[in-house]
């Protein structure tokens, strides 16, 4: 008999060799119906997987990431089978589950059209109806290569050849279709209830632009049609909110062919950006940070010393000055190290919090560039906190509070992930354990739930990532807290302790916005361009009905400007309805309509973007109202 510990902590005994599906059936018929896979000792397996030893078992449904991934991975195999039926000469590449769906890459003679996707969807429906069982089998390396060569699948052969010696080479079969795959998968094709092919795009084999361009079909799938419909509605809403479209329409920012990945900010976009940066500076001053500015170009030797050369060289730009090699900074950290190192520090000076809005450049492939979300140059709101070991927890708690305050102002909810040591890391096991435990303790002291991302930390230390949830339910990773014992070592940073001896400080890297450009893109989509009044580039638009009201308009404008309100007057000889419609399209928070009555009574007729017609209001009352809304950063 073996002992199986379930998610609720209960322990059950079963015969050796019982499958995950049979365990689910022994618990309840309802659970067996919705179970898609099982997590055995932390590893996701098919329901047919036999349990031979004592283990922990978590039965996964579509509500669990592992269950969703298995379900969508199977849908990608159904897609591949449909494509092979319709286009027998198509060569298969890869087809994983991804966040919100799946994709499969194909090598085909001509790109897929929208009509092709419709045909493929119909074929997929047939395969689902045929309800093929997914069966896993393995082959020795040479047999696996021969098997895929006989099927004329060169990409699969390449993948097999690249697998380490001794690696288990597994395949999944459904009907007459077979694919190289590590799994896991759900039981049968008939279990897929609702799916949609979303789009097609070009993708280089293995992400390398020197390789052949393949056709990537994206799709998604759900266990309920209602959930699929809701997702498609969200996607349509996201298209309307696309920051690239709104950035142009609202005259905020754009990207031109002459500078792919290098954003241009227009006057209104600069207003928005400056408001964000001023808020950032104000809050950091209150939290005891000092602002610094470090150069964009620094000697190549510095990047060897920092470790970026070994871990980040492929993403860097280089230049020569006076025959010496220089690099354009991809990160602000090394500059911050030099600022700290410039003089001797006492333990009484610590913690020292150095903050920087630093412009960085990173080489990104043209295929992944996306508006302000993925660019080649951006401003990162970095800070580096240097401290004694006994200050670690209090400083992490302070950063968490600061980040929490920032996100609340914008109305964001968030979840937190703790990322641990990656393979290509620097430093000792002891340092990594100490750093990881410090982050865990701070989160637990704050009462914040968190998920662990094994192996996803930075190369110099573990990190906490903050994932914002926007108004249509999408998540965006923005804030980061990274604890680093390595960089102070590499730069030989010290402070004088109470014993009069030199000691090594500990350092936190952290960002709140992350990339300012990306944060602006997120805000633009979150608010659909209708920014709260404190962020709006134009907060008030004055709309006179006739030219004779222009003198009073100037008076109203001056009264608002004297209080720091950003205001424009539309003095064009156009009908008032047209002016109102245009101001609405510009998403201005307040419109003040001025006619003869308003001029005589020293009032303004107020229209709110949010609440519509608010009626007449004394000018002084409106000024007080909007000043209060701006001061309180009302959303």
Curated annotation (Swiss-Prot):
Zn(2+) binds at residues 333, 384, 509. Its main location: cytoplasm. It catalyses: tRNA(Thr) + L-threonine + ATP = L-threonyl-tRNA(Thr) + AMP + diphosphate + H(+). NCBIfam families: thrS. GO terms for biological process: threonyl-tRNA aminoacylation. Catalyzes the attachment of threonine to tRNA(Thr) in a two-step reaction: L-threonine is first activated by ATP to form Thr-AMP and then transferred to the acceptor end of tRNA(Thr). Also edits incorrectly charged L-seryl-tRNA(Thr). GO terms for cellular component: cytoplasm. Homodimer. Keywords: Aminoacyl-tRNA synthetase, ATP-binding, Cytoplasm, Ligase, Metal-binding, Nucleotide-binding, Protein biosynthesis, RNA-binding, tRNA-binding, Zinc. It comes from the Bacteria. Residues 1-61 form the TGS domain. Binds 1 zinc ion per subunit. Residues 242-532 are annotated as: Catalytic. This is Threonine--tRNA ligase. Belongs to the class-II aminoacyl-tRNA synthetase family. GO terms for molecular function: ATP binding; catalytic activity, acting on a protein; metal ion binding; threonine-tRNA ligase activity; transferase activity; tRNA binding. Its cofactor is Zn(2+). Its EC number is 6.1.1.3. It is found in: Cytoplasm. Gene3D superfamilies: 3.10.20.30, 3.30.54.20, Anticodon-binding domain, Bira Bifunctional Protein, Domain 2, Threonyl-trna Synthetase, Chain A, domain 2. Transmembrane segments: none annotated.
